[in-house]
Amino acid sequence: MWLLYLLVPALFCRAGGSIPIPQKLFGEVTSPLFPKPYPNNFETTTVITVPTGYRVKLVFQQFDLEPSEGCFYDYVKISADKKSLGRFCGQLGSPLGNPPGKKEFMSQGNKMLLTFHTDFSNEENGTIMFYKGFLAYYQAVDLDECASRSKSGEEDPQPQCQHLCHNYVGGYFCSCRPGYELQEDTHSCQAECSSELYTEASGYISSLEYPRSYPPDLRCNYSIRVERGLTLHLKFLEPFDIDDHQQVHCPYDQLQIYANGKNIGEFCGKQRPPDLDTSSNAVDLLFFTDESGDSRGWKLRYTTEIIKCPQPKTLDEFTIIQNLQPQYQFRDYFIATCKQGYQLIEGNQVLHSFTAVCQDDGTWHRAMPRCKIKDCGQPRNLPNGDFRYTTTMGVNTYKARIQYYCHEPYYKMQTRAGSRESEQGVYTCTAQGIWKNEQKGEKIPRCLPVCGKPVNPVEQRQRIIGGQKAKMGNFPWQVFTNIHGRGGGALLGDRWILTAAHTLYPKEHEAQSNASLDVFLGHTNVEELMKLGNHPIRRVSVHPDYRQDESYNFEGDIALLELENSVTLGPNLLPICLPDNDTFYDLGLMGYVSGFGVMEEKIAHDLRFVRLPVANPQACENWLRGKNRMDVFSQNMFCAGHPSLKQDACQGDSGGVFAVRDPNTDRWVATGIVSWGIGCSRGYGFYTKVLNYVDWIKKEMEEED
C-alpha cells in the first residue's frame, strides 16, 4: 500500500455546523480550542474526503473527553460507508467511557465522518472539570479495488472485472484472458478469436478455456502460416470433446480444417481426429459453436517438416562438391568448386564461386555449372624481346610454359643475383589463370640495352683530319646534334644522350632556353641521318657546376638529354658504357674520338674518327701556360693527343665521347666528352672526365640504364 501524508489543520465550527475538509492525502482533526478545554453544548460534523481510489485511515493521538456510561454526555462518533465505526469518550485509564486508544479506523470509500458532541456542562460531584478534547491524524491509503470486498458485507461489491483485475495507486483496470476482448464498459470480456495467427515452426493451439468448457457463440479462425518450403503436421491431443449429435454430423459445434484453401476435414464429437499431414505451409482452423453446450473443446500440436531437394550431380570430372551431404532440405545449400587449374563456367560466364540453394518447391535455385581449364590468355609482349612456347604451340591453358628471350646481341635480360637468365624468362600458366615466374611473379622480365659491344668495331687507326670515314657499326653510339650548330653526343641506354653542356649553352652566348634541339642517330652519313628523322627531347639536364658566363672555365661541361621515346637498338644503334675505375685514364692509353666536325677546314658529311693517347696532365698544363692561356684545367678533366701528332677533335665534334675499349670485358667505355681545345690539330684536346660524374649521371637517369 502507498501511504501519503499531508498536515492540514481542521477546526470545528459552531454548534450544529459541518466542516468539509478539502481533498488532501493526509492531515489532522482537533476538537475546538484544542489543547484548551472544549466548549459546552456543542456539536459539529467533520467530513474527511480523500481523492477517489483511496480510503481514509484515522488514528487518535490524544483523546480527553468527559467520561460517561455509554458515552451519553460528551462523545466523538465515527462513521463511514453508511455505517457507524463507534462512539467514544473518556480517556485512557478512566473507569467509565470508551476511549479509542491507538485503534485505526478505516473507510472502504474515500469519505469518513467525525461527529463531536458536548452537553451543557462538565461537572463531577459539584466540581467543574476541564477536558482538553482530542487530536486525530488521517491519511489517504491506496484502495485495492481488486481485493474481494464481499467480506466487508457490501451489498454491491466493486469492481466486477469479469476476468482479470489490476490495481494501481489511486485506481484499477480490467483485462481479459487470451482469446477475449475487453468491452466498452471496461469490465466485461467477449470472446474474440476471429483472427488468431501462428507463425512459429511448431506450437500448440486450443479452444478457449480448454480443457474447461468453451464459451458459446464462437466464430474462431486460427491461421497457421509458416515459411514456404515447410509442410505442416497436425496432432490432436486428449481430451477431444466437441458437442455433436448421434444422427446428424456436427449440427451444433464443429471444427473445420483448410489447407491451401481446401477443406481437409470437419470434426466434432469425442473421437480424436487422426494425425494430419497437410502438405501445405498454410492451414486455417475454423471453430464454430452455438449458444449452448458444455463440451471441453480441443487442443492440437502442430509441427513442420522441411521439403527435400535431389542430390546434386556434377557434369564433369573436374567439378568438386564441397562437404557433400547424404540429404538436402529446404534452405540447405552446396558449394561447387573446380580442381586446381580449372574455373567455374555458367553458360558463357566465368564464376568466381558457386552456391546453389534448395528452394521451397524442392528444386535447386540454379543449375550445376561446368569446370573449364584455366586460360591465361596470350602472353604479354616483351619490349625488345619475344617468347616461345616450351609446351604445345599456341596453347595458353593451365600448366602451359613459355620462355621469354631478348633480342641479342643488342639486349640482355635483366637477372637477379644468383639466378640464371633462363630461370628469369620461364613463365608458367598457373591455376589462378595468370602467367607467372618463380622469381619475378607476374611481372614480365626486362630487356636491358647491351652497352659497348659494337657488331662491327673499329680496327683502323685513321685521323679525323684527312682520315678515313667510319664504317657503319664502328661507333653505333654516335649522336649528331644540331642545336647552336653541329655537335656530337653518345647514346646511353636506349633513351639518354650524353653530351657537353656547352653544346646546349655555348660560351660567350646568351643563355637560351628555347633553342631547337635536333638529335639524330643510327647512321654515319649526315644526309641519311636527316632522313631517319629527329628524335624529340623530353628533358634536358645540365650539371650544376657548369657556368656559361665563364668563357675559360669548362668545369662541369656535361649534360644529359632524355629522349621522348626509347630507341630500338640494332647494329647501327647501340649505347656505350660508363667507366667504373681510374685505369681508363692511364697515361698513353689509346682512345677514339668520332664526329661530324670540320675536316680540313670543311664541314664533314660523313662520320670520321681519330685514335688518340691519354696525355700527361702536367704536360698539358705546361703546354697551356706556354700558350699564355688561363683556361681552367681541373681534376674533373683530362687531356689527350700530342702537339706532334697533328690529330685532334675539331669544331663540330664537341659533345662526342672519348671511347676506350676495355680489354677485360671487350666493351667500349665513354671515358671523356669532347670539351675544349686551341684550334684544330694544334696540340692537346681537353675532355670532361666522365668517371667523376657517373653518380650524377645515374641519379639523373634514375637508374634507367
Swiss-Prot record:
- List the catalysed reactions: Selective cleavage of Lys(or Arg)-|-Ile bond in complement subcomponent C1s to form the active form of C1s (EC 3.4.21.42)
Biological process GO annotation list? complement activation, classical pathway; immune response; innate immune response; zymogen activation
Sushi domain ranges (all copies): 307-373, 374-449
Location of (3R)-3-hydroxyasparagine modifications: 167
Places the protein is found: Secreted; Cell surface
Q: Which residues carry this modification: Phosphoserine?
A: 206
One GO MF annotation is:
molecular sequestering activity
* Record: residues binding Ca(2+) 1: 66, 74, 119
Q: Altering residue 435 to R: what's the impact?
A: In EDSPD1; uncertain significance
Please give the annotated consequence of changing residue 654 to A.
Abolished protease activity
What does the entry list as the binding residues for Ca(2+) 3?
Answer: 243, 253, 290, 294
The listed outcome for residue 156 to A is: Does not affect association with the C1Q subcomplex
User: Would I find Coiled coil among this entry's keywords?
Assistant: no
Disulphide-bridged cysteine pairs: 71-89, 146-165, 161-174, 176-189, 193-220, 250-268, 309-358, 338-371, 376-429, 406-447, 451-577, 620-639, 650-680
Keywords recorded for this protein, A-Z: Autocatalytic cleavage, Complement pathway, Disease variant, Disulfide bond, EGF-like domain, Ehlers-Danlos syndrome, Glycoprotein, Hydrolase, Hydroxylation, Immunity, Innate immunity, Phosphoprotein, Protease, Repeat, Secreted, Serine protease, Signal, Sushi
Effect annotated for changing residue 463 to Q? Abolished autoprocessing, but promotes extrinsic cleavage by thermolysin
| Outcome, altering residue 81 to N | Does not affect association with the C1Q subcomplex
Q: What is the effect of changing residue 144 to N?
A: Does not affect association with the C1Q subcomplex
Q: What does the record note on quaternary structure?
A: Core component of the complement C1 complex, a calcium-dependent complex composed of 1 molecule of the C1Q subcomplex, 2 molecules of C1R and 2 molecules of C1S. The C1Q subcomplex is composed 18 subunits: 3 chains of C1QA, C1QB, and C1QC trimerize to form 6 collagen-like triple helices connected to six globular ligand-recognition modules. Within the C1 complex, C1R is a dimer of identical chains, each of which is activated by cleavage into two chains, heavy and light, connected by disulfide bonds.
The name this protein carries in UniProt is Complement C1r subcomponent
Tell me the organism: Homo sapiens
State the taxonomy lineage: Eukaryota, Metazoa, Chordata, Craniata, Vertebrata
